[in-house]
UniProtKB/Swiss-Prot annotation:
SMART domains, per the entry: TPR
Main localization, broad class: plastid
Gene Ontology CC: chloroplast thylakoid membrane
Its biological purpose: Essential for the assembly of the photosystem I (PSI) complex. May act as a chaperone-like factor to guide the assembly of the PSI subunits.
Membership in a protein family: Belongs to the Ycf3 family.
Bilayer topology term: Peripheral membrane protein
TM ranges: none
PANTHER family: CELLULOSE SYNTHASE OPERON PROTEIN C, TPR REPEAT-CONTAINING PROTEIN MJ0263
Taxonomy, superkingdom: Eukaryota
Protein name: Photosystem I assembly protein Ycf3
Amino acid sequence: MPRSRINGNFIDKTFSIVANILLRIIPTTSGEKEAFTYYRDGMSAQSEGNYAEALQNYYEAMRLEIDPYDRSYILYNIGLIHTSNGEHTKALEYYFRALERNPFLPQAFNNMAVICHYRGEQAIRQGDSEIAEAWFDQAAEYWKQAIALTPGNYIEAHNWLKITRRFE
């Protein structure tokens, strides 16, 4: 049974109903419908913290999905899971891949910046200020891109850029 039929969450049920209606009325191929079903089930599993199941669904959705824009969101969600699991190198790889297909994902730039900032803080704790500065500079570049795409968002990042004199 598809995951969307067993989820008891009201919002997930509502999303599933709306998604099913859209799948019926919007002209799509069976492959696109199947890809979306896997994507939807991946999001449901991810929201419940079932990351292994979510990844399986996302990988299957990637196999079926041909639209670069839709693939970007699948890749982004895979990156989120790797971030949650502390697999930052893998997460960065998936965020990069998502941005290759859709350069207008400010949340991917933000998450990449957060990872770089975290690595900068780790370098400071290890006593390597030069490496830390390089990570912080990279974080700044990603945050600038996120802010440029969505002015008014990422206020904490914007303040950090000003405080550290990295905002131009």
